[in-house]
Amino acid sequence: MLETTNGEASPEDPPLNLKSLSQPPQKRSRTVEDFNRFCSFVLTYAGYIPTPATEERPWTPPSSVSPHRTEESDGWDSSPQLPVPSDPPQPPATSDISTIETFVMKAKSQGGGGNSIMKTGGPIGGSGEQVKKGSRRKRRQLHRGGVTMSDTDTDEEERDKRPAGSLPAPQLPPSAESSRDGGGSSSDTDTQVMDEDIMVESGDDSWDLVTCYCEKPFAGRPMIECNICCTWVHLSCAKIRKSNVPDVYYCQKCRGGRGSGGTALKEEP
């Protein structure tokens, strides 16, 4: 009994190799190189990247030999090796091509997803979503811009359809502005009235009349009358400003004879 317990194993205990074979195989973690190879294959398949001349065959899935097999073999060296069952049949390469085709179709349906991948040149996970969001924002802005343009067009059409009576009020004439400013004095208005009274139309007979001692015709220029001799003299010859026209005026001749007949001049109002 002791020999059987020490030297021989009981038939109930399964062998160690069967325990290790019953565990599911561990999946190999994907690396950045694998992802880059997958992206390059997808882009070449979609036609965004020209196929290099050196590559004769497209990218194929990794071979059946995986690193976890070597790790398992390293751990089995201590135990006696048993016949290893064959690996489960892997799906054909057509499944990978079908997934790539669906990926390309989705990218095209989303409005140039492949172009966004080309622009980013990095992983598809985060940057691709950001590019998609940016393209959506641009589309919204363009749509909003089109709406605003249509609104402006309608506003212009409404302005064209408005009647003439709805136009803004015309500007006031300069005379009203001058009256508002209040810069003009009452004397200026008086002189303007006097000038208008003195001015004569060109068709009148007095237009060519010569009365001033300058021997020049009236010609419509403002003149003043002497209170003694009743002679009309140009204001420019009498050196009188239009803004300061006196009520009583004496010409040069009357002023010269004022010394002898000064009493008569004083009697006149």
From Swiss-Prot:
Span list, region Disordered: 1-31, 52-193
Biased composition regions of type Pro residues, renumbered to the chain: 82-92
UniProt entry tagged with the keyword Magnesium: no
Single GO MF annotation: zinc ion binding
Residue intervals passing through the bilayer: none
Subcellular location: Nucleus; Cytoplasm
Zinc fingers classed as PHD-type: ranges: 209-257
GO cellular component: a single term: nucleus
Compositional bias segments (type: Basic residues): 133-143
Main localization (coarse): nucleus
Pfam families noted in UniProt: PHD
Alphabetical list of SUPFAM superfamilies matching this protein: FYVE/PHD zinc finger (SSF57903)
Keywords of this entry: Autophagy, Cytoplasm, Metal-binding, Nucleus, Zinc, Zinc-finger
PROSITE patterns cross-referenced by the UniProt entry: ZF_PHD_1
GO biological process, one term: autophagy
Gene3D superfamilies: Zinc/RING finger domain, C3HC4 (zinc finger) (3.30.40.10)
Domain text: The PHD-type zinc-finger domain is required for negative regulation of autophagy.
General function of this protein: Acts as a negative regulator of autophagy.
Family: Belongs to the PHF23 family.
Designated name of the protein: PHD finger protein 23B
